[in-house]
Curated annotation (Swiss-Prot):
Keywords of this entry: Cell inner membrane, Cell membrane, Ion transport, Membrane, Potassium, Potassium transport, Transmembrane, Transmembrane helix, Transport
Pfam families per UniProt: KdpA (PF03814)
Organism: Yersinia pseudotuberculosis serotype O:3 (strain YPIII)
Gene Ontology CC: one annotated term: plasma membrane
Name of the protein: Potassium-transporting ATPase potassium-binding subunit
């Protein structure tokens, strides 16, 4: 079993690097603005029809365009979800959502969170799934990548004032990257048996003579961008545990690769654009080391399972509760770490049924900001925030002004870095406290004790860090949780994006200084170790008290009793 686990991890990482490296080269060309003759006429036609000028923007113009674009997306999706009962492509005649659930869902999909307080097969029409959720899966992913593009340009350029054009970036990312790759992935999913139709639900009689309804729908097209764009919202309530969404071990492996593909490729692109591939490789090494350790811990915890099972007559202590037998413990553990290291949130098992230790690792990966590969775009700019913090700490230790890639990191940069790093922990801890201190918040907790606390902490961590997965023992389809989590998702998304763009605006104007004798090398093993230590230190200082009240206490209860 140990050999199988390491073989699975090694094969996953190998295929990931083989696929992401050439994609990184293509993304580097997009960042640098190289024209692509194949679609240049299509692009020019879009600018003429829309009346948008493709002149470059400064930092605040870029931020305003991104913010307005996403606010408009929230409004349009909210209206669609509220009125779906009166619109076509609704063969099951499903009514519109309640206003608070529609608001929660609109904010969720526009912010790339895809938190779902509903089950798709009995709540959403095909039109809402296709024109609403699937469209936002593309656009929210493009938003994150565009912000990463702007920050990469800020490091690569010097003595400049502009970061690119937000509209050009959004269109080119969608047209050249997301749509073609999503089409290929969708065809792979269809070949594996994922549904893709507009038929009405099938009403059948089982062998036992019981009536059963089989949901249909355009699943593969949404499933492809769900994983590629690290969105995570499932067409069905069971998400990727549903056999119509993720039917085989091969489709499961492809989903995991798709989740990490663009985040990993962006690291390669970063190194190419700044003119030093070692910088991108250092980020990948730091991310990979944390990721591999996390996977090993979850696999160990789930294989160890519950020590109380064998004395009760079970064949094994291993924890198969809430898992699909077609995937098994190893692939399920890998998927859980992939989806929470990235801001995806798709699940192929019930995270609420993991052991206390096995469930704590996905929770912790979200709490450190999902910087271990992370979401499309957000993973890279999140890790670069920790890079800036690391060089600042190193500068304090040796008494030098911190610098990164030849650019001095000043007071404003560090203020924005601190703001971006601290905004999500603040939301998580305050939101959890609010839920536990109010009657409306406590009413949703279905499990007592440490596990009930973990469910609330997981929900706020997932929402604030734009992940979307859940410990599903919490009743969240209430006005209190829908509004609380909507606020957490919105602030968690744009409370990081706006400081990142402010940092980019500051860095792009600076001159690049040649490296001196006292300059900290940022492409070697020493810096990789410092970076990992900084990520772990910030995560530990922020969340250890909360984790001690939840999963740590639950783990000790199980094993000390044994």
């Amino acid at each position: 079993m140990v050999a199988s686990g390491f073989l699975l991890i090694a094969s996953f990482m190998l295929v990931l690097f083989v696929l992401s490296r050439p994609l990184g080269g293509f993304l580097a060309r997009l960042i640098e603005g190289e024209p692509f003759s194949a679609l240049q006429k299509v692009e020019a036609g879009l600018w003429r029809c829309s009346g948008v000028k493709n002149a470059e923007m400064n930092g605040w113009q870029y931020a305003l365009a991104i913010l307005c674009f996403n606010l408009l997306g929230i409004v349009l999706l909210f209206v669609l979800l509220m009125t779906q009962g009166s619109l076509p492509l609704n063969p099951e005649h499903l009514p519109g959502m309640s206003w608070h659930l529609a608001l929660n869902t609109a904010v969720s999909f526009v912010t790339n969170t895809n938190w779902q307080a509903y089950s798709g097969e009995n709540t959403l029409s095909y039109l809402s799934q296709m024109a609403g959720l699937t469209v936002q899966n593309f656009l929210s992913a493009a938003t994150g990548i565009a912000v990463a593009f702007a920050l990469i340009r800020a490091f690569a350029r010097h003595s400049a004032t502009t970061l690119g054009n937000a509209w050009v970036d959004l269109v080119r990312i969608t047209l050249y990257v997301l749509l073609p790759i999503a089409l290929i992935i969708a065809l792979i999913f269809v070949s594996q048996g994922v549904l893709q139709n507009l038929d009405g639900y099938l009403h059948i009689t089982t062998l036992e003579g019981v009536q059963q309804t089989l949901p249909m729908g355009p699943v593969a097209s949404q499933e492809a961008i769900k994983v590629l764009g690290t969105n995570g919202g499932g067409f069905f309530g069971a998400n990727s545990a549903h056999p119509f969404e993720n039917p085989t071990a091969f489709s499961n492996f492809v989903q995991m690769l798709a989740i990490f593909l663009i985040p990993c490729a962006l690291c390669f692109a970063f190194g190419q654009v700044v003119g030093d591939n070692r910088q991108g490789h250092a980020l990948i090494w730091a991310m990979s080391l944390i990721f591999i350790v996390a996977v090993v811990v979850v696999m160990y915890a789930e294989l160890a399972g519950n020590p109380h099972l064998s004395p009760l007559g079970a064949d094994s202590n291993s924890n198969m509760e809430g898992k699909e037998s077609r995937f098994g413990i190893l692939a399920t553990s890998l998927y859980a770490v992939v989806t929470t290291a990235a801001s995806c949130g798709a699940v192929n098992a019930m995270h609420d049924s993991f052991t206390a230790l096995g469930g704590m690792i996905p929770l912790w990966l979200m709490q450190i900001g999902e910087v271990v590969f992370g979401g499309v775009g957000s993973g890279l700019y999140g890790m670069l925030l920790f890079v800036l913090l690391t060089v600042f700490i190193a500068g304090l230790m040796i008494g030098r002004t911190p610098e990164y890639l030849g650019k001095k990191i000043d007071v404003f940069d560090m203020k924005m870095t601190a703001l971006a790093i601290l905004v999500t922990p603040t939301i998580v801890l305050l939101g959890t406290a609010l839920a536990l201190c109010t009657e409306a918040g406590r009413a949703g907790i279905l499990n007592p004790g440490a596990h009930g606390f973990s469910e609330v902490l997981y929900a706020l961590s997932s929402a604030a860090n734009n992940n979307g997965s859940a410990f599903a023992g919490l009743s969240v389809n209430t006005p209190f949780y829908n509004l609380l989590l909507a606020a957490a998702m919105f602030i968690g998304r744009f409370g990081v994006i706006l400081p990142v763009l402010a940092i980019a605006s500051s860095l792009v104007a600076k001159k690049r200084q040649p490296a001196g004798n006292g300059t900290l090398p940022t492409g070697g093993p020493l810096f990789i170790g410092l970076l990992i230590g900084t990520v772990l230190l910030v995560g530990a200082l922020t969340f250890i008290p909360a984790l001690a009240l939840g999963p740590v206490a639950e783990h000790l209860q199980v094993w000390l009793a044994h």
